[in-house]
């Protein structure tokens, strides 16, 4: 297991089972997770609006910019991508975040060897078809912090 920032690579298995990784609750208490994911020989990358941000006049400003609007992308709170290539997972987590939930999930479903989990701005959890059997929702994402 190798971790760098929001990216992680897991090789092989943990004994006789896959590695179990948590997906952070974007508005939950620090270090809380809302779901766990079982993976083996894969890269896991998450982009979100909850790490680097500030709030001004009640509006959240974060580091993932929508190039069409010139301001922070607003449709997602977090995007987790699973792929066999780290550079692909990292780029796609940010790109899907900017595309938004519907277009982002459509892209994920079209790409081979790519799966994803999206938490929308309304805390809806979208899961790609290839992860449905490997993802466990522990609790619904919450709004317990700004």
Over which residues does each language-model region extend?
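Mature catalytic core of soluble alpha/beta enzymes
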Residues: 1-146
């Amino acid at each position: 297991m190798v971790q760098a920032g929001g990216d992680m690579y897991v090789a092989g298995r943990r004994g006789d089972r896959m590695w179990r990784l948590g997906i952070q609750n974007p508005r939950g208490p620090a270090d809380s997770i809302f779901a766990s994911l079982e993976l083996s020989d894969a890269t896991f990358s998450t982009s979100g609006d909850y790490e680097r941000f500030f709030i001004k006049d009640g509006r959240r400003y974060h580091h993932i910019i929508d190039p069409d609007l010139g301001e922070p992308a607003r449709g997602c709170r977090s995007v987790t991508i699973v792929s066999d290539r780290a550079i692909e997972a990292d780029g796609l987590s940010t790109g899907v975040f900017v595309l938004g939930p519907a277009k982002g999930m459509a892209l994920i479903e079209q790409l081979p060897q790519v799966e994803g989990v999206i938490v929308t701005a309304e805390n809806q959890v979208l899961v790609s078809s290839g992860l449905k059997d490997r993802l466990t929702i522990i609790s619904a994402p919450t709004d317990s912090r700004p």
